[in-house]
């Protein structure tokens, strides 16, 4: 793992780079940031961009390694429990590696928040399966690193569905808009009550954090100013 690079944002003009570095020098930057949000909202893209911009280590979910995922999207009722447990064990392993990693590593960015894990389980599992999942979850989540900042990306369900269609992932083709609506509602409910860490809620419906440099830079500047409590980033057209 590399140390934090205090000169940070790549692919930006020199004046902005200097300004962001000056802003950052005035604050205590979060040592662990978790980016969250429903399928298609762009959490992995943002996590990767932030990690690259500031030369930080990044922890990413690996859905392509979950052998149950494709079967789950074809038949959620039959394959919900194994797909959920596989993701849980994968996320736990990554966080345990983070805890045991280089003590000098200053910043990590992940595209998941382990506290949110039961959200998917509650949506997809029946009551008996959920009780089994919850028993496993509660036994293995102890003593894990907690983020210093959670960034929750939001978008309307229609926008999420359109983004999924546009990116053309074969595994995701069976995903219905109604399922995305269930997940979106569950995320909204979860983060409405979430207060365990500082939280930045970002409305992504009219911005493009993947390819629009101005949208991305403006969000980075807002992140640099985010300290404690709950914050909302809601850019206007």
Positions of predicted regions on the chain:
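Glycine-rich phosphate-binding loop used to anchor ATP phosphates in small-molecule kinases
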Residues: 79, 83-145
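NTP-dependent small-molecule kinase module
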Residues: 165-174, 181-237
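Conserved lysine of the Walker
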Residues: 43
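Conserved substrate/cofactor phosphate-moiety recognition/catalytic segment
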Residues: 52-90
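A glycine- and Lys/Arg-enriched "phosphate-lid" helix/loop adjacent to the NTP-binding pocket
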Residues: 117-188
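Extreme N-terminal, non-catalytic leader segments
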Residues: 5-31
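Hydrophobic anchor at the beta1->P-loop junction of P-loop NTPases
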Residues: 35
């Amino acid at each position: 793992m590399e140390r934090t690079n205090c000169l940070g944002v790549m692919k930006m003009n020199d004046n902005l780079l200097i300004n962001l570095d000056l802003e950052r020098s005035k604050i205590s930057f979060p040592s662990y940031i978790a980016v969250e949000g429903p399928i298609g909202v762009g959490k992995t893209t943002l996590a990767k961009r932030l990690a690259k911009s500031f030369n930080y280590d990044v922890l990413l979910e690996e859905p392509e390694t979950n052998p149950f995922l494709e079967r789950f999207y074809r038949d959620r009722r039959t394959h919900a429990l194994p797909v959920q447990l596989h993701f849980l064990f994968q996320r736990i392993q990554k966080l345990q590696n983070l805890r045991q990693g280089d003590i000098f590593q200053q910043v990590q960015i992940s595209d998941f928040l382990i506290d949110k894990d039961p959200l998917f389980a509650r949506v997809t599992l029946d009551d008996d399966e959920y009780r089994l999942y919850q028993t496993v979850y509660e036994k293995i989540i102890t003593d894990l690193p907690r983020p210093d900042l959670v960034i929750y990306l939001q978008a309307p369900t229609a926008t999420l569905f359109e983004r999924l269609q546009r990116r053309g992932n074969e595994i995701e083709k069976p995903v219905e808009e109604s399922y995305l609506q269930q997940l979106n509602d569950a995320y909204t409910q979860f983060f409405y009550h979430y207060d365990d860490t500082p939280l930045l809620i970002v409305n992504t419906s009219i911005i493009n954090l993947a390819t629009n440099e101005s949208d991305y830079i403006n969000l980075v500047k807002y992140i640099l100013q985010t300290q404690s409590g709950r914050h909302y980033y809601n850019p206007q057209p």
